[in-house]
Amino acid sequence: MSNYVIPQPAQPSRPVQGTDARFPVRRVYCIGRNYADHSIEMGHDPDKEPPFFFQKNGGNVDSSGEFPYPPFTNEVHFEVEMIVALKSGGANISEADAMQHVFGY
């Protein structure tokens, strides 16, 4: 057990339906295909370069969690993401083999 100078947050995880197991949430890679207008606004061609970004685990809130924000906030923007949880890594995976790498949704 490490003695951290600054306490580390707990490992984010999600329950696996029908079991008592949990799936760890480590890295979330996002492809914003629905961000075409914003991509064009930023000078990019979304058909050639799909917007790609990372989601920080600390920013993830599930349906049972709270979303803290400053009390005098007048406007809050939110998004809902659909995720695919992978059970194995890989690169250049064919479409025919892709589902072999999926743990769940």
Task: List each model region and its residues.
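Glycine-enriched loop-and-adjacent helix/strand subsegments that border the catalytic/binding cleft
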Residues: 17, 22-105
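Extreme N-terminal tail/first-helix region
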Residues: 1-16
